[in-house]
Amino acid sequence: MKKAVLKVASFALCLALALSFAGCKDSKKDVYNVGICQLVTHGALDKATDGFKQALIDKLGKDKVKFDYQNAANDSNACATIVNSFVQKKYDLIMANATPALQAAYNATSTIPILGTSVTEYGVALGIDGFDGTVGGNVSGTSDLAPLDKQADMITELFPNAKKVGILYCSAEPNSKYQVEQVEKFLKAKNIEVSRYSFSDSNDIASVTTTAASNSDVIYVPTDNTAASCTETIGNIVVEKKVPVVAGEASICRGCGVATLSIDYYDLGYKTGEMAAEILTGKKDIKNMKIEYVDAKKQYNKTICDKLGITVPSDYSDMGEESWNC
């Protein structure tokens, strides 16, 4: 009887130890496989991806993480194909760079952790009513939303005599629509006439921009991936017509704007990477992680300001001569 009890006890102990070791192995893998789906190539998204990768390398070590970077070339259907391949390969985490990439990943898996970045409003992007800052489930990330009320204030600060503001944006991007609604509300409260000028894709940007520039004192371009991919087209038109653009983010401002209140997308991506490291190493559960933000700062494009004869206040920093154009 004693021998039987000892055998059972020994077996139980061995089983417990085996499970314990198995748990340790799963919680700290030799190499983490991370899939990155980026909507399109442009300065802001590129910087976010760079920051994300660097943060994971800094936190886990270069030999501990393997990246599979895929670019969807501004095709939402390609986003779905890319993230489904990540799911089939059973990657440890998916980083979705921009709203269509996040939406595709959200629809592709409910088990693999998904972190979004360069996403403006998660509630709008994922159709969550009463969004409280936490997506829950297997999704979290970072937002590139700058204070929209302060962006509206920037327009009136720089151009106090402006009576007509045109808002130029892509109608196919839900986050752009959200920003347009908010900024329009803030500007109308200042008794400014606001008109919307929307394009469905890059093919009609030139004609819509020309119309906007012909009927506006100032143009506002929100954080918008399609606009960010074609700032040269916008810039050539507005400079020729001498109509200033206030941009929702830095890459658009570098290409065609005079000023912006914008976040740094490298910092945004880096914060996303820090979140990824905490998830992969088991330090945090993604279902409890709130959407994170980074601080915005006032910046101006000296090159375009000089061309238009615009002087900005001293609290704006010069973003330099780097230009991200089509």
Tell where the protein language model's regions lie, with residue ranges:
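Beta-alpha junction/loop-to-helix N-cap segments that form part of ligand/metal-binding clefts
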Residues: 70-130, 221-248
